[in-house]
Amino acid sequence: MNLFEAVILGIVQGLTEFLPISSTAHLRIIPALAGWKDPGAAFTAIVQIGTLAAVLIYFFRDITAIVREVVAGILKGRPLGTTEAKMGWMIAAGTIPIVIFGLLFKNEIETSLRSLYWISGALIGLALLLTIAEKRMKNQLRQGVTMKSMENIGWKDALLIGLIQSIALIPGSSRSGVTITGGLFLNLSRETAARFSFLLSLPSVLAAGVFQLYKSWDLIISSPDNLIAIIVATIVSGIVGYASIAFLLNYLKSHTTSVFIIYRLLLGSGILLMLATGMLPAT
């Protein structure tokens, strides 16, 4: 991978990691269209550390408050004594399903599930689910139901969204896409669903990134070009990712996810068309 490819893929990762359109799908599709090699699941996981840094910086106050209250709660013998401590434990519990499924289906995630047929199917499938979630939310609001804020998220919400997050292991589904969809079904406001989605992503993205970095370390340092490319892509993804978080949270305050639904349907259909005409290889 040369420096130009690294910058482009870093921008793509940063733009698409937090928008509900799947970063993994775009990191798979764009190299295929450009005639580049598939960067692979390991590259995707490592570069996500850049977008992880974006979440840490953007939500610095929230995260420090959560960590501080979790530690204080343990020391005082009241682990669930505050809202922030409770949120920390809910995030931890919500991370368990994706860790289990990620380990169980590790080989499939890194190989067969990266087929463009799977990716296009996931893009279209989640778009349809998100459409249903939006329509349900519209009906709920019409009936006078108040959408939940961060303070109203309970254990049931956290565990169900955590379980739903496991679907994001399928390339093309989108981690933020599936968790936001799950949040809407559970009567979270769009902004709250996105905010909780980003916080919930921290443990699993960190674990996946560190694991792949450890696993691929010898290969990375064997070539200075590979090392520089990954560093550049990670830094770029972090900078662009920060802007993406700010944009999405502000956008969802007054807009639905319709634009992302339409984009997913068009992209998924376009990939299927290119596969059918031989313009793209499936693997």
UniProtKB/Swiss-Prot annotation:
Descriptive protein name: Undecaprenyl-diphosphatase
Gene: uppP
Record key words, sorted: Antibiotic resistance, Cell inner membrane, Cell membrane, Cell shape, Cell wall biogenesis/degradation, Hydrolase, Membrane, Peptidoglycan synthesis, Transmembrane, Transmembrane helix
GO molecular function: undecaprenyl-diphosphatase activity
A GO cellular component entry from the record: plasma membrane
Substrates-to-products reaction catalysed: di-trans,octa-cis-undecaprenyl diphosphate + H2O = di-trans,octa-cis-undecaprenyl phosphate + phosphate + H(+)
Function: Catalyzes the dephosphorylation of undecaprenyl diphosphate (UPP). Confers resistance to bacitracin.
One GO BP annotation of this record: peptidoglycan biosynthetic process
Pfam families xref list: BacA
Topology relative to the membrane: Multi-pass membrane protein
Enzyme Commission code: 3.6.1.27
Transmembrane segments: 40-60, 85-105, 113-133, 153-173, 193-213, 227-247, 259-279
Highest rank taxon of the organism: Bacteria
Similarity comment text for this entry: Belongs to the UppP family.
Note: Bacitracin is thought to be involved in the inhibition of peptidoglycan synthesis by sequestering undecaprenyl diphosphate, thereby reducing the pool of lipid carrier available.
Subcellular location: Cell inner membrane
InterPro entries given in the database record: UppP
